[in-house]
Amino acid sequence: MNNAMKRTPALLLIIAAPLLACAQLVVTNTQTPAQLVQNTLLGGLVATNIIFNGAPATAVITQVGAFNSANSNVGIASGLILSTGNVASAIGPNNGAFANTILPNNTTDPDLVLLANGQNIGDAAVLRFNFIPTGNTVSFRFVFASEEYPVYVCAAVNDAFGFFLSGPGISGPYQNNAVNLALVPGTGTPVTINTVNSGTAGNQGAAANCAALDPNWQANAQFFVNNMDNNNPDPTAVRYNGLTTVMTATAQVQCGQVYSIKIAIGDAGDDEYDSAIFLEAGSFSSPSMAVDATAALPSVA
């Protein structure tokens, strides 16, 4: 074997190494929630009164970070991640222990409790801010992921998350008359582990629990990505056992008025098995309303 042939395998490894590194989800935890909202999440809007878990969002928090997943299976290239555990636990592959962070805080949220049918909520990550829409709609793109898939599909208790919008013209059942924007596409059904999954109840669940939330729950399998239950060696896979496809949260709003959004996620029933929300960078936007600037010309007799 000549020297050129001997060098070939080493050269291939050198070339392949950056590709392998780029294929994995990258999560950073160096910015405050306020910085992440303003610099990463928002697209052309300005946030005010940014609060995380009831306090000014001016400290770096392990439950909030930035991510780059251009070559992973999240489906969103980059953005903000919010988790019931340490956001670093999202990094795959998904072929080892569960992402299962037990946090020292006991944060809860009444709207998540309502979504979880009165179950206790812990390890909550609650990010709230105000904004003024520049158009008559507001929208953003997201993916929900959880370690509770597939075992706890159709279980009596599931981790909960929601996007609670309040402000002029909004009337809903949550705090400050908010509505939840985290809905199964084309429906008014909240996105949960029991409404978006593979269509099969887990061994800790019963199909009746899923059917009680949505009689057509099995049809929602089209919005689910199976991540192979801790048995996926693919380096592009995130660590959670299942995740949704990319979805869009949207609402009608009044241009120029002040609105509040609360992005919240929490562990239900216990503090085990992390869940997370991936929010697309720059997608939180309110397209400006078109103005017809054409002047009417006087008619000529």
Model-derived features: where do they sit?
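Sec-dependent, cleavable N-terminal signal peptides
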Residues: 1-24
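Aromatic (Trp/Tyr/Phe) and Gly/Pro-enriched flexible surface segments
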Residues: 24-297, 301
